[in-house]
Swiss-Prot record:
PROSITE patterns: PGM_PMM (PS00710). Catalyzes the conversion of glucosamine-6-phosphate to glucosamine-1-phosphate. Binds 1 Mg(2+) ion per subunit. GO terms for molecular function: magnesium ion binding; phosphoglucosamine mutase activity; phosphomannomutase activity. Pfam families: PGM_PMM_I (PF02878), PGM_PMM_II (PF02879), PGM_PMM_III (PF02880), PGM_PMM_IV (PF00408). It catalyses: alpha-D-glucosamine 1-phosphate = D-glucosamine 6-phosphate. This is Phosphoglucosamine mutase. One of its GO terms (biological process) is UDP-N-acetylglucosamine biosynthetic process. NCBIfam families: glmM, PRK10887.1. Its EC number is 5.4.2.10. Its cofactor is Mg(2+). Mg(2+) binds at S102, D241, D243, D245. The gene is glmM. Keywords: Isomerase, Magnesium, Metal-binding, Phosphoprotein.
């Protein structure tokens, strides 16, 4: 069935407009609660959130909706998305709920869910919830109503989990790290994780006010981190996004490394330690240079649809552990069930400390192909798939690039945008081809 509310990463939108309203959040939680109770007499869910001011409102509405369906609730407060996933599993909860719009501005928010195993839920589950939303509510009797309480020291429990993924024989003593938490969910947790492992920590983007999440800081605005690393003469810079599930790194020279490069580094580190790495999963957007570099070392490479949930699904299908996206979502399934910016950072820092190699030394064999990504805003009713001129232009560009580049055109799963990506060894050629395709895409006909 076609989904009305769920996108590629839960439900997301502008606060105060459907579906990100308190009345819908209550209805949603009630519907989810009814779905849970079909298999479990007394479900218990965890609810975590980032630092957006609207999180209070949505948290209360979700709590009421679950309780009204006879579901118990445990409130975690501000906590990274992967922290909610971890605690859902650790607390043996039925479901984990995250209130966050990830890297979006404060005026957006969203709601997403984790299974009892701490993994993203399949499309079929979301469709079952959407069906339940079309049905009349069935309010639980007073004696059957759910209860709500707060989990003490949720942040501390997650901090210990993150530290447990770092080799106990190693330390970060003598390493200076600038940490940028994007004024988001990891604003207290991230500095503590690195500090407790011995690092000298400089914190930026760690003063949320409810309105400044992701504003000129974090993984979507790494310029501030680059400047801070240089100014503080730090060894590394760690950039997270608002819910801390993605990671970008900066080295001592101020060079920025994206998720594609870090995925290669994670694989290369394991190979250097004698571990088997049969393959890694990227996405349709993963830079060709990473694919070439991995295959040159005997590591298979498969592309999934864009979105960490699809990378995860492909990893399970292949039986592999490593995957990721250029945006910084990285998966190491032997460490965590979902993408985790802090855990990923610790794996990379561990590789550097253990080997004595810098980020640039680890990645000297990976020269990323120039990749141009243009966003074309579509007007309501425009159907780019019926644009025959775009189809013809795309085929022409593919013929021009041959084996030295790629073209990818896809609709955003969270915004009314068409993403046009062209990758080529020649940057000027990539820019010219992308501009050509974007121009044609703007004239897409009405549906």
């Amino acid at each position: 069935m076609a989904r009305t509310y769920f996108g590629t990463d839960g439900i997301r939108g502008l606060v105060g407009r459907s579906p990100i309203t308190p009345d819908f959040a209550l209805r949603l939680a009630h519907a989810v609660g009814r779905v849970l109770r079909r298999k479990e007499a007394r479900p218990m869910v965890l609810i975590g959130k980032d630092t957006r001011i609207s999180g209070y409102m949505l948290e209360s509405a979700l709590e009421s909706g679950f309780n009204s369906a006879g579901v118990d609730v445990m409130l975690l407060g501000p906590l990274p998305t992967p922290g909610v996933a971890y605690l859902t599993r650790a607390q043996r909860a039925s479901l984990g709920v995250v209130i966050s719009a990830s890297h979006n501005p404060y005026y957006d928010n969203g709601i997403k869910f984790f299974s009892a195993q701490g993994t993203k839920l399949p499309d079929a589950w979301e469709e079952e919830v959407e069906q339940a939303l079309t049905e009349d509510p069935v309010w639980a009797d007073s004696a059957a109503l759910g209860k709500a309480r707060r989990l003490e020291d949720a942040a501390g429990r997650y901090i210990e989990f993150c530290k447990s993924t770092f080799d106990h024989a190693l330390t970060l003593k003598g390493v200076k790290i600038v940490v940028d938490a994007a004024h988001g969910a990891a604003y207290q947790i991230a500095p503590k994780v690195f500090h407790e492992l011995g690092a000298d920590v400089v914190a930026i983007g760690c003063a949320p006010d409810g309105l400044n999440i992701n504003e000129d800081v974090g993984a979507t605005h790494p310029e501030a981190l680059v400047l801070a690393v240089r100014a503080n003469k730090a060894d590394f810079g760690v950039a997270l996004d608002g819910d801390a599930d993605r990671l970008l790194l900066v080295d001592a020279a101020g060079r920025l490394y994206n998720g594609d490069e870090l995925l290669y580094l994670l694989a290369a580190d394991r190979l250097a330690r004698g571990e088997a790495v049969p393959g890694a999963v990227g996405t349709l957007m993963t830079n060709m240079a990473v694919e070439v570099a991995l295959k040159s070392q005997g590591v298979g490479f498969v592309r999934a649809k864009v979105g960490d949930r699809y990378v995860l699904e492909e990893l399970h299908r292949q039986g592999w552990t490593l995957g990721g996206e250029g945006s910084g979502h990285l998966l190491a399934l032997d460490k965590h069930t979902t993408g985790d910016g802090l855990v990923s950072a610790l794996q990379v820092l561990q590789a550097c400390v253990r080997s004595g190699k810098s980020l640039s030394q680890w990645l000297s064999s990976v020269q990323l192909f120039p990749q141009v990504l243009l966003n074309v805003r579509l007007q309501p009713g425009q159907d780019w798939k019926r644009n025959t001129q775009l189809e013809e232009a795309t085929e022409a560009v593919k013929a021009e690039l041959g084996d030295t580049g790629r073209v990818l055109i896809r609709a955003s799963g969270t915004e009314p945008l068409l993403r046009v990506m062209v990758e080529a060894r020649d940057g000027d050629q990539a820019s010219r081809c992308a501009e050509r395709l974007a121009s044609v895409a703007k004239n897409s006909p009405a549906a």
